[in-house]
């Protein structure tokens, strides 16, 4: 059904959902910026953003709280976008970066970097800019190996998922082994990291996360047509003139890059890439023009909310955001397994 000015009812609904999600994200961001040992009311947070707040509020928000908030936002966006791409790529609702091993590969690479290039104060002895590089290399290596092992007259989506799950388990074992064999002061740092936490984020983390996120999301929107074609299946995509295997490999690489970006700044926050695309698909449908931005905003909301809960529920003790996303995501994964048991 077309409305006036050529806008379909589905497009109008997608725009409404997008604006609501954008408003919710802004609201959660403001609430998060006000929470901590010193509570700052939302209106004072808003005044601070516009340069009219007190010096103390500005110090608390801009120096200590905003870096972790923006890091959480970027991590959620990247993980959700990666999950949306993977689910369309393999046409399997259970696909996500953490389930098929991509997140695990990134985590192993980053933990290795931490083990070899950190001092007794758990501070890195190299630039933070090496973390995204290590995460991307680890994620890409696992993604490439999974793709090659699944390739037989074309990469089978079913084999991709099965082999990916095996690599995910192997990556977890490798990370645990590194923590056991490494010095205790490095193991404790790595443990917080692999649980998924934005604690200790600074503006250098934010700079890296924002630059990489913007570049990768721009590439995602350029590749929207390829994403929509891949969802149709190999035969239809090939009939439409798409280079199926080349596009599949490119989208897998894009997903690994998004995952590497998120893991490098926030650790392995699980199940965001699984849940966000499912929720978005129910709200806006399966067209990637609407699905991708909706998934990204839902992913940001999930990680921001998990970080708020982790900071406040057991205060003054902070619980990593990944603990709460896993607490929600694991039952959701079981629900999806049950729902798709006959598929």
Swiss-Prot record:
Alphabetical GO biological process terms: siderophore-dependent iron import into cell
Keywords: Cell membrane, Ion transport, Iron, Iron transport, Membrane, Transmembrane, Transmembrane helix, Transport
SUPFAM superfamilies cross-referenced by the UniProt entry: ABC transporter involved in vitamin B12 uptake, BtuC (SSF81345)
Membrane-crossing segments per the record: 15-35, 69-89, 97-117, 130-150, 160-180, 204-224, 249-269, 289-309, 317-337
Gene disruption phenotype: Strains lacking this gene show a reduction in growth stimulation by the iron-hydroxamate siderophores schizokinen and arthrobactin compared to wild-type.
Gene3D superfamilies: ABC transporter involved in vitamin B12 uptake, BtuC
Taxonomy, superkingdom: Bacteria
Induction section of the entry: Induced by iron starvation, repressed by fur.
GO MF annotation list: transmembrane transporter activity
Membrane topology label: Multi-pass membrane protein
Function of the molecule: Part of the ABC transporter complex YfiYZ/YfhA/YusV involved in import of the iron-hydroxamate siderophores schizokinen, arthrobactin and corprogen.
PANTHER family: FERRIC ENTEROBACTIN TRANSPORT SYSTEM PERMEASE PROTEIN, FERRIC ENTEROBACTIN TRANSPORT SYSTEM PERMEASE PROTEIN FEPG
Subunit details: The complex is composed of one ATP-binding protein (YusV), two transmembrane proteins (YfiZ and YfhA) and a solute-binding protein (YfiY).
Name of the protein in question: Probable siderophore transport system permease protein YfhA
UniProt lineage: Bacteria, Bacillati, Bacillota, Bacilli, Bacillales
């Amino acid at each position: 059904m077309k409305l006036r000015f050529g806008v379909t009812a589905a497009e109008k609904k997608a725009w409404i959902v997008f604006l609501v999600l954008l408003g919710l994200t802004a609201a959660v961001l403001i609430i998060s910026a006000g929470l901590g040992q010193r509570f700052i009311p939302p209106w004072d947070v808003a005044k601070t953003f516009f340069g009219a707040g007190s010096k103390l509020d500005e110090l608390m928000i801009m120096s200590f709280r905003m870096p972790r908030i923006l890091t959480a936002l970027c991590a959620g966006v990247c993980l959700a976008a990666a999950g949306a791409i993977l689910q369309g790529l393999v046409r399997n609702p259970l696909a996500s970066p953490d389930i098929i091993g991509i997140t695990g590969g990134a985590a192993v690479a980053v933990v290795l970097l931490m083990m070899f290039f950190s001092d007794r104060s758990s501070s890195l002895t190299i630039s933070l800019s090496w973390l995204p590089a290590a995460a991307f290399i680890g994620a890409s290596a696992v993604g490439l190996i999974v793709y090659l092992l699944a390739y037989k007259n074309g990469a089978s989506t079913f084999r991709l998922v099965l082999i990916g799950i095996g690599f995910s388990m192997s990556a977890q074992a490798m990370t645990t082994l590194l923590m056991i064999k490494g010095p205790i002061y490095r193991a404790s740092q790595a443990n917080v990291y692999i649980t998924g936490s934005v604690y200790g984020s600074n503006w250098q983390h934010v700079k890296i996360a924002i630059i990489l996120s913007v570049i990768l999301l721009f590439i995602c929107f350029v590749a929207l047509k390829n994403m929509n074609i891949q969802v149709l299946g190999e035969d239809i995509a090939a009939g439409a003139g798409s280079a199926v295997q080349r596009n599949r490999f490119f989208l897998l690489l894009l997903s690994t890059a998004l995952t590497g970006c998120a893991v490098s700044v926030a650790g392995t926050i699980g199940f965001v890439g699984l849940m966000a695309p499912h929720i978005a698909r129910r709200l806006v449908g399966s067209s990637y023009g609407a699905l991708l931005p909706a998934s990204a905003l839902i992913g940001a909301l999930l990680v921001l909310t998990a970080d708020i809960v982790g900071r406040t529920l057991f205060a003054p003790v902070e619980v990593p955001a990944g603990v709460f996303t896993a607490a929600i995501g694991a039952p959701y994964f079981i629900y999806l397994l049950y729902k798709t048991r006959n598929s």
